């Protein structure tokens, strides 16, 4: 009914990457997103490398994409990057049927999620 919201423009010192339709529930994905939020990218990559969560591989790919976007598209220094935002959104939910005893049936819900990672260049000020 109203105006469509304009896409948020990123500042010059930020870059982002989005992974859509990840086959995991938003709740499980958010556990891994919280793991990297606010950390330097080198530390975040190391944490994801040794995480036991299955979805950590996909989160690592998305973070590497954000780092590459920062380096190639925005000319930012990789050593000064920090994960500013890592947030999760719901995508669609596939509904499946599972036959049960006595002629009954049950619904199986297979959720998908979206992941957005924003990295920011934070320069250390010389005193």
Curated annotation (Swiss-Prot):
**InterPro entries named in the record:** Ribosomal_uL22, Ribosomal_uL22_bac/chlpt-type, Ribosomal_uL22_bac/org-type, Ribosomal_uL22_CS, Ribosomal_uL22_sf
Q: Which domain of life is it from?
A: Bacteria
A biological process term (GO) from this entry? translation
For this record, the Gene Ontology CC terms, alphabetical, are: cytosolic large ribosomal subunit
Q: Which PROSITE patterns match?
A: RIBOSOMAL_L22
One MF term in the entry's GO annotations: structural constituent of ribosome
Q: Is Transcription one of the keywords UniProt gives this record?
A: no
Q: Which Pfam families match?
A: Ribosomal_L22
Q: How does it assemble?
A: Part of the 50S ribosomal subunit.
Q: Name the protein family.
A: Belongs to the universal ribosomal protein uL22 family.
The job of this chain, per UniProt, is described as:
This protein binds specifically to 23S rRNA; its binding is stimulated by other ribosomal proteins, e.g. L4, L17, and L20. It is important during the early stages of 50S assembly. It makes multiple contacts with different domains of the 23S rRNA in the assembled 50S subunit and ribosome. The globular domain of the protein is located near the polypeptide exit tunnel on the outside of the subunit, while an extended beta-hairpin is found that lines the wall of the exit tunnel in the center of the 70S ribosome.
Question: Which PANTHER family does the protein's record reference?
Answer: CHLOROPLAST 50S RIBOSOMAL PROTEIN L22-RELATED, LARGE RIBOSOMAL SUBUNIT PROTEIN UL22M
Q: What is this protein called?
A: Large ribosomal subunit protein uL22
Gene this chain is encoded by: rplV
